[in-house]
């Protein structure tokens, strides 16, 4: 009996360790970063719609809701959307898969944001009733015109030192490191990359919430 109980506790501890701790958890999103070993499957999520950001080049398999398994070749910085019933990611290409899964807690929205507020060089990756996802690249020593973000998750693929000038003239310095996964409140600003490295960020803006931090 004691041996069985010890084995049971070991199993529980292994299961707990296999589920990554959230990098971000608030009333809008749960964001988890995970490394999936070759031939393994990502940990169970919360059964929520999500945007998944890939952090390395890999081959993965997934099963869409009610469909057959499909194989995808993904690149670092690629993002896919999955509904609540879409299957988990499997590292099917012989290499590990590093990813950030951003679960969306809102009920969704019929609003279409499009490119509203975005800087001209931002690349809109996709938008639906749950999220707007876009790619940000700011070369070292360059500036962006004034633009506006909603509340968002930022997944940093190349870190940099940024300086933001707000509409009231105040200045905020922001240091992003490669690998950061952070929550940022909505803001309007002019951005300047004052560092020596290019900034590359994926922004995931959840929908279905009233404006505010």
Regions found by a protein language model. Name each.
Residues 1-4:
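Positively charged n-region of N-terminal signal peptides that target proteins for export
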Residues 6-15:
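Bacterial N-terminal signal peptides
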Residues 21-55, 117-144, 151-154, 204:
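A short glycine-rich, His/Asp/Glu-containing loop-to-beta-strand
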Residues 42-44, 61-62, 82, 86-93, ...:
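Short beta-strand His + acidic residue motifs that chelate non-heme Fe in jelly-roll/DSBH
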Residues 47-65, 149-168:
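Glycine- and acidic-residue-biased ligand/ion/polar-headgroup-sensing regions
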Residues 57, 84-105, 159, 186-209:
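Ligand-binding loop in jelly-roll beta-barrel domains
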Residues 66-84, 170-186:
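Short acidic-glycine-tyrosine-enriched beta hairpin
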Residues 88-137:
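Surface-exposed beta-loop interaction hotspot
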């Amino acid at each position: 009996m004691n041996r069985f109980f010890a084995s049971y506790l070991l199993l529980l501890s292994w299961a707990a360790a296999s589920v990554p701790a959230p990098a971000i958890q608030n009333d809008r999103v749960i964001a988890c970063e995970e490394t999936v070993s070759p031939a393994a499957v990502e940990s169970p999520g919360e059964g929520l719609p999500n945007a998944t950001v890939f952090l390395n080049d890999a081959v993965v398999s997934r099963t869409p809701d009610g469909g057959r398994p499909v194989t995808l070749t993904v690149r670092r910085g690629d993002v896919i959307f999955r509904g609540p019933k879409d299957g988990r990611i499997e590292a099917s290409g012989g290499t590990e898969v590093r990813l950030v899964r951003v679960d969306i807690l809102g009920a969704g929205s019929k609003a279409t944001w499009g490119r509203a507020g975005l800087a001209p060089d931002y690349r809109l990756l996709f938008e639906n009733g749950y999220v707007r996802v876009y790619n940000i690249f700011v070369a070292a020593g360059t500036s962006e015109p004034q633009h506006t973000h909603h509340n968002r998750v930022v997944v940093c693929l190349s870190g940099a030192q940024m300086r933001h000038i707000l509409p009231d003239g105040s200045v905020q310095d922001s240091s992003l490191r490669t690998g950061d996964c952070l929550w940022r409140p909505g803001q309007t600003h002019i951005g300047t990359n004052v560092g020596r490295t290019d900034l590359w960020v994926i922004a995931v803006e959840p929908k279905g919430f009233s404006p505010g931090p």
